[in-house]
């Protein structure tokens, strides 16, 4: 089985390593034609504006949208969740106008938990997946979801309260956190299960 990891910027190497540990061949996606090789796609964390710009510059936008519309699983982690969202605001500056794929009916707030030094780890219960040990690094929150998307995971944060950190829309999944940093395999096992259906 081959699963793609978008390899334009961000922590794609860490995702690929965990996939390899599960016996899956990770394909570093840099060109649209590579999507034909893979059964699912992970859009990693990194810098969401940079990733969005590179997707556009490399001519990947239409290819990824078509890939998702064909029902292939696409998972966005942290910045990847921002890339999947229809609406993006920043905690400090408001509307960002940044390029996204807009595939999921979700709104996200960038940097919702604060700066890098306010990063933390938490255990999150995500519907269909279970408890996941998650790292939140300058992470977004999923502030809204509308049909057919739904929020599937929440955390209670001492500073900002109960917030959405996972969402699902068909075979599209967005998570605010970095599962690849904690090494928790449950997200990857779930992606594999979606491919095998």
Locate predicted features.
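Redox-cofactor binding/interface segments in oxidoreductases and associated redox assembly factors
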Residues: 43, 76, 175
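Short coil/turn connectors at secondary-structure junctions
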Residues: 1, 37-38, 70-72, 98, ...
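Cysteine-nucleophile active-site neighborhood
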Residues: 48-124
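Amide-donor transfer/coupling interface in amidating biosynthetic enzymes
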Residues: 110-197
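N-terminal beta1-alpha1 cap of cysteine-dependent amidohydrolase-like domains
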Residues: 1-57, 62-69, 185-197
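Hydrophobic anchor at the start of a short beta-strand
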Residues: 26-27, 74, 172
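A secondary-structure boundary/capping signal
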Residues: 8, 77-79, 104, 138, ...
């Amino acid at each position: 089985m081959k699963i793609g990891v978008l390899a334009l910027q961000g922590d794609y190497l860490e995702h690929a390593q965990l996939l390899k540990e599960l016996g899956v061949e990770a394909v570093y996606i840099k060109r649209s034609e590579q999507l034909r090789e893979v059964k699912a796609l992970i859009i990693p964390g990194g810098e969401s504006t940079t990733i969005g710009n590179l997707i556009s510059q490399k001519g990947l936008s239409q290819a990824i949208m078509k890939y998702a519309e064909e029902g292939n699983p696409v998972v966005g982690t942290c910045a990847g969740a921002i890339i999947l969202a229809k609406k993006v605001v920043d905690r400090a500056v408001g509307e960002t106008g940044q390029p996204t794929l807009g595939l999921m009916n979700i709104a996200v707030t960038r940097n919702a938990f604060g700066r890098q030094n306010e990063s933390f780890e938490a255990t999150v219960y995500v519907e269909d997946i279970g408890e996941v040990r998650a790292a939140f690094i300058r992470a977004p929150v999923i502030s809204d979801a509308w049909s057919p998307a739904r929020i599937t995971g929440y955390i209670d944060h001492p500073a900002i309260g109960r917030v959405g950190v996972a969402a699902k829309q068909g075979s599209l999944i967005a998570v605010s956190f970095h599962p690849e940093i904690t090494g928790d395999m449950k997200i990857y096992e779930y992606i594999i299960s979606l491919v095998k259906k």
